[in-house]
């Protein structure tokens, strides 16, 4: 335990805050060719370098669609592609947000559907906002 004099001289140092989506907190300065740590962004744009499927941890079983994305801050991350079916391939430009996938280790980001090169989920009726799906055509009203 430190003495009062030691605390006066040095003081307490607070532990560094750990971020759940660290890639969103870095920005790239192209003039100085440096990456700087900042307040963070809600989303970041990136280019897909690889699109593939992977299997989840036990006890789950599936083929989850993921993409390796090189972000505008020159970092490369693994992002999950939500929804059924997608049109992504290498060199597709995507927008990512934070948010992990609990049964996929190392996947801390989600791709936002319905923006840039990512199409929304087709024929989705409920929870459309999360999947970039447009409102379906309403049935014509019957006349009496």
Swiss-Prot record:
Residues 125-144 are annotated as: Disordered. Residues 131-144 have a biased composition (Basic residues). InterPro entries: NA-bd_OB-fold (IPR012340), Ribosomal_uS12 (IPR006032), Ribosomal_uS12_bac (IPR005679). One of its GO terms (cellular component) is small ribosomal subunit. It comes from the Bacteria. The modification 3-methylthioaspartic acid is found at residue 103. GO terms for molecular function: rRNA binding; structural constituent of ribosome; tRNA binding. GO terms for biological process: translation. Keywords: Methylation, Ribonucleoprotein, Ribosomal protein, RNA-binding, rRNA-binding, tRNA-binding. CDD domains: Ribosomal_S12. PROSITE patterns: RIBOSOMAL_S12. Belongs to the universal ribosomal protein uS12 family. Part of the 30S ribosomal subunit. Contacts proteins S8 and S17. May interact with IF1 in the 30S initiation complex. With S4 and S5 plays an important role in translational accuracy. Interacts with and stabilizes bases of the 16S rRNA that are involved in tRNA selection in the A site and with the mRNA backbone. Located at the interface of the 30S and 50S subunits, it traverses the body of the 30S subunit contacting proteins on the other side and probably holding the rRNA structure together. The combined cluster of proteins S8, S12 and S17 appears to hold together the shoulder and platform of the 30S subunit. This is Small ribosomal subunit protein uS12. The gene is rpsL.
